[in-house]
Design a protein with these regions (language model features):
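Chalcogenol-based redox active-site neighborhoods
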Residues: 1-158, 163-167, 174
Length: 179
């Protein structure tokens, strides 16, 4: 998927970001979660908004199976006020989302992971090794897709298998990088 960021089989970079309440959230320690999904998203991108319900449904459904989800917004809030921490907090509902919504103000975490779009999903196994990277499913306009690629990756990992496909092209709005 490119020279920057991490590739399949590589360990997750460090992540310590504030959530919508200001509390710092980190990745689980190896072995603490059956799998971890780090999903780049935002408040204004039509692709991210179209996939939102599918991602949050998966987060709620897989929580009881030990899967941890984190949503990250790395957009430049100066140029895109809809993605400011205040706007993120106004949109966020923990019960509905099923995951924390994190603000990557410096964009350092997005760069370390190699995130490019909203959405852009990184699915890690229990040892925090990247096992799936890409889109939630094949069509942001078709809710019936139900985040099929994401769910397939999680089912494979929970069964001790490698996801197939392991990579799909992330489709969405580009991350709005700082100048």
């Amino acid at each position: 998927m490119g020279a920057d960021g991490i590739g399949l089989g590589e360990l997750a970079p460090e992540l310590a970001l504030p959530d919508t309440s200001g509390r710092i959230t980190t990745l689980p320690m190896p072995g603490e979660a059956a799998a971890t999904v780090v999903a780049w998203t935002c408040n204004h991108c039509p692709y991210a908004l179209a996939w939102h319900d599918r991602l949050t449904a998966a987060a709620r459904e897989y929580a009881d199976r030990g899967v941890r989800f984190l949503a990250v917004n790395s957009n430049d809030a100066q140029r895109y006020p809809a993605d400011s921490p205040e706007a993120m907090a106004a949109r966020y509902d923990d019960a509905e989302w099923g995951m924390p919504y994190l603000h990557d103000e410096t964009q350092g975490v997005a760069r370390a992971f190699g995130a490019r779009t909203t959405p852009d999903l990184f699915v890690f196994d229990s040892d925090l090794s990247l096992r799936y990277r890409g889109a939630p499913d094949a069509d942001h306009q078709d809710p019936a897709q139900g985040a099929a690629w994401l769910r397939s990756a999680l089912e494979a990992l929970l069964a001790g298998r490698e996801p197939e496909p392991a990579e799909t092209e992330p489709v969405g709005c580009s991350i709005k990088w700082r100048s």
